[in-house]
Amino acid sequence: MSRGQELVLLTGATGHVGYAVLVKTLQAGYNVRATLRDMSRADAILSSGPVQEALSAQDLDLSFVRVPNFTAPDAFGLVLSNVTHVVHVASALRRGTSTDLKEAIIDVAVQGTRNILRAAHNCPSVRRVVITSSVSAIVDQHPVVSQSPAGRCVTPLDRHADYDAEYYKGDSLKAYTAAKTAALNATDAFLATADGGPTTLPLHFDVINIMPSFVFGPKGLAATPSDVTNGSNIFGIGLVMRHKPWDGIRLEAVCCHVDDVAQVHVNALNDHELLPLKVGAHRDFILGVKFKPEEIGEIVRRRFPREWWESESATFGARGTYDWYHTDYDVGSAERLLGRPFKCLEEQIYDSGSQVMEMLKGMTTRSYN
């Protein structure tokens, strides 16, 4: 089957990572069917420059299908027709006023993942399911200390038991970690038991888990600087933009460029040459480069004009910082799949900072017109 005949079902296409995956998937020549909770978001995707360029360069199909609730028993049962690959990027985030983090975040992540796997099990055309996991799913998050005993790297095969409710009580960020951990464990359990619900069909696909660290870099659908820093970028370019205290936040200073994350997802779709199909198996890939927060300010001062950072009131003039620690990860397999070393911190900060600058320049220009 030629790539132009292959169809990728993509979740999370409006997010930081998901949109980047969408663009690179189209650029690689795949047709895409994107799930949306709100179909009005399709216009923003279709009108974006990178998507328009990708569609005009090749004869491809980009379609959208509404999946309002990932936890519904047959949420994906009707959307996988003729799909050859599934890329599940969407992450459960706290929505509305719900204070039940288990229901709002963890159950959505776990049940959504199970539903996708079960639907794929019932769709013979699916050959591969690629899932966006996280390094937070495989390291112990309590207590927060260095995860790297002398001489040992955390590997993609490491796992962590599900967290109990006391760990994430009242903390949506910890609930996100618990959700990623539980979803990864649910994926492993599915493959181990071929838990496909009522079907007795043998498995006919494999699973690829992509495990990024903090994802820095431009956001394709961002409209304002606050959109850019809403998410993991707050710990990247957001460090020199946030004027509020960090209140003792301590985090793992390991990051990756959104372009690398997206490209690894797309390369993982190649089940012929780059990553041959292994039915019933899972293969996992970690992305991350170590950094020190003080390096972010140094990059900004080196790469951007003085007026953007010289005073504390400047766009990139914030002086605060957070506490940090390092974890050693085995990233060799991901770099081999990518085909090159990961982009460094400087590229991550420069690219996201440049997006902020262009936005602000555009706002200034419009205000004078």
Curated annotation (Swiss-Prot):
User: Pfam families given for it?
Assistant: Epimerase
Q: Where is the signal peptide?
A: none
Q: What happens when the gene is disrupted?
A: Leads to a strong reduction by at least 90% of the production of fumonisins B1, B2, B3 and B4, and accumulates 3-keto homologs of fumonisins B3 and B4.
Q: Which GO terms describe its molecular function?
A: oxidoreductase activity, acting on the CH-OH group of donors, NAD or NADP as acceptor
Matches recorded under CDD domains:
AR_SDR_e
| Pathway in which the depicted protein is active | Mycotoxin biosynthesis
> What is one process in the GO biological process aspect for this record?
fumonisin biosynthetic process
Q: What is this protein called?
A: NAD-dependent epimerase/dehydratase FUM13
- Record the organism: Gibberella moniliformis (strain M3125 / FGSC 7600)
